[in-house]
Regions:
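Flexible, acidic/Gly-rich N-terminal and inter-domain linker regions that tether
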Residues: 1-68
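Short, intrinsically disordered, charge-balanced linker/junction segments flanking boundaries
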Residues: 10, 223-230
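Conserved, mostly hydrophobic/aromatic
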Residues: 15, 42, 70, 165, ...
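Residues at alpha-helix caps and immediate loop-helix transition turns in enzyme cores, especially N-
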Residues: 38, 119-123, 214-218
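N-terminal pre-triad scaffold of radical SAM enzymes
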Residues: 39-77, 84-110, 161
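Core AdoMet radical
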Residues: 77-92, 99-123, 127-192, 201-208
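Catalytic cores of alpha/beta
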Residues: 148-155, 211-226
Length: 230
């Protein structure tokens, strides 16, 4: 435990203090006491940076039509067993008003990935209406998949503040096993950079427990988030 205590103290005191091997060691802890110590150290860092607060966001699921065919996803294009839906503008704005009435200060607009001028303009209208309804006080996060730089810029100009685009895994090899050949890991990473370029606060994420995933893969995910400042 002494070695672990020293490692946790260093990690808590200085950002980006851990090597890949040290991250693998922490991810592989099995002793209940050591796991509790790790959780306590992580919670202390969380409290130091963001306090003992819980932030609530209203999520509006606008549709489950998606151009992607990711093997793990229930709304993948090739899944013929799921009923498809797309909310119209009136339904989305009704949900927006409901969230405003509940005094949510942050909204997430989420759907499957659609790349078309019609969809881009639809989201633009929704964003401008949210700004109008909320008096500019509502933070808006989009989770709408991979898009062009022009589309990202248009949505940012219309009032979006944040964007969530999960990388799913930072391992190109593991990514390739989870997606068809026409799904590009490099394109995914490039979209994260484009979002930052367009002025978004960018969020991402990974899946844990994937078949074939290793602790080294998970350590790589943490370093990926560090390197891209996510």
């Amino acid at each position: 435990m002494n070695g672990l205590s020293t490692l946790l103290e260093r990690a808590s005191a200085r950002r980006h203090a851990l090597s890949r091997d040290e991250l693998v060691a922490l991810l592989g802890l099995a002793d209940p006491g050591e796991i509790a110590a790790l959780r306590a150290a992580a919670y202390a860092v969380k409290v130091r940076h963001s306090g003992r607060l819980v932030s609530l966001r209203g999520i509006i699921e606008m549709g489950n039509v998606c151009a992607k065919d990711c093997y793990y996803c229930g709304i993948r294009k090739g899944n013929d067993c799921v009923g498809r839906f797309e909310l119209d503008e009136e339904a989305v704005l009704r949900a927006v008003r409901r969230n405003i009435d509940l005094r949510y200060g942050s909204l997430v607009l989420q759907s499957g990935e659609i790349a078309s001028e019609k969809h881009t303009a639809f989201i633009e209208r929704i964003l401008r209406k949210i700004d109008e309804l909320g008096g500019g006080a509502i933070g808006v996060t989009l989770s709408l998949g991979e898009q062009s730089e022009e589309t990202y810029a248009r949505w940012r100009a219309a009032g979006a503040h944040r964007y969530l685009l999960r990388i799913e895994t930072s391992s190109p090899e593991l990514y390739a096993k989870l997606h068809p050949a026409d799904h590009s890991f490099e394109r995914r990473v490039d979209c994260l950079r484009l979002l930052r370029k367009c002025g978004y606060q960018v969020g991402s994420g990974v899946m844990s427990g994937l078949p074939g995933q290793t602790l080294d893969d998970l350590a790589g995910d943490i370093l990926f988030f560090r390197d891209l400042d996510l």
